[in-house]
Amino acid sequence: NYIGHGCEIRGSILCNKAKLKNYVHIFENSIVGDNSIINERVVIKPNIKIWPQKTIEPLAIVDRNIIWGSKHSKSIFGEHGISGIINVDISPEFATRLGAAYGSIFKKGSKVVVSSTTSNSARMFKHAFISGILSVGVEVFNMSSLLTPLARHAINFLSVEGGIHIKLSEGNPNKLKVDFMDSKGASISRVTERKIENSFSREDFKRCSGDEICRLNNITDFKNYYVRS
């Protein structure tokens, strides 16, 4: 095994040929598998299992087990939003936390749209995102099933600060795609993506008290509004 300078390992296990670069912090009851590489300034939270031959990229905060794939990155967003295998890369718990991170970039009392397509999977994750957003004091317009162009139009029509649209990847019913949009209905900037990623990785959520939870507005007939407009 190799352990770099300034590392801290608390009550955890390093398996055969695991490599820790400088200033890695591993907290209680975690396991780093054989031949895994943990890069500089990574934080591994308690009770985490990293399976063999994984690479954790620098500055990442690992807060869930790393089983599938070969790498874990600090970055959540890809070239076009966020995508991943349902209940592997993207779980309901992940979606709730990401919803809280997204909501935390707004002031309390702000308003956003959350929509999905008709699949049961997309609808389930829509509700997970909504729970996270509401938990940080942001009001949500819960749209009935919409296609992406209608979701973008809804943001402009309702004059809200942004929106999330959840759908399945074309040709793969096990892969989810999540689009994040700004107040004009356009995809968010890379700067905004980084704000969300930082809030998510640090768990720096603007949690609110019970009496600050905002309304959930259920909109079931937006297509009719769209036709009229």
Regions found by a protein language model. Name each.
Residues 61, 100-108, 134, 138, ...:
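Generic secondary-structure signature for well-ordered alpha-helical cores
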Residues 1-68:
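Structural signal for interior beta-strand "rungs" in well-ordered beta-sheet cores
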Residues 79-81, 116-117, 166-169, 183-184, ...:
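Fold-independent oxyanion-binding glycine-rich loops
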